[in-house]
Amino acid sequence: MRCNTGRECPRRLRWWLLALLLSTLSFGCAATSTTILDEEVVTNQKHMASYKSLIIRDFELKSELYTDAPDAKLSDREHRYTQIPSQLAENIERYVKARQIYRDVSRSGQPTATTLVLKGKFTRVGRFRISITGTLHDGASDQEVAFFRQTLWDVLDSTETINLLSREVADFIDRIQYK
């Protein structure tokens, strides 16, 4: 890149610097970023591996989080939001069963002394972010033994998002077995 005239060289240099800046910015940003932020707390005095079964309850999802319309006037997209809690519970059940952490994993049943009960709620549901909080309760005393909070950013496809969240919840359940 040789400059023959005095004015042409700074102009070419500016264009090269601009092109370099734009390429750096485009490579530095991901198309979709599914960053999961989490908080995990285990408060149980008993060893978590002593539990032999897990009951998974549907997470609570209030309609105010995704619509302003009454139930009778929900759009197709808003109607799909009502199915998210059961999809999340089904996926968590599938992932936990695949890891064979517990002898029994179900979505219903009566808790016993060796049962953990997973409960939770959606705290934010939107186009760009889905947040959940969940707790594990001792089956005998209904005392909270563990807590987690997870947020998934840059939500584009709710089906994939629910799959990622359920995998993260199953990972949490697996990790706390050693605490």
What are these regions (language model features)?
Residues 3-17:
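Bacterial N-terminal signal peptides that target proteins for export
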Residues 16-26:
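Bacterial N-terminal signal peptides
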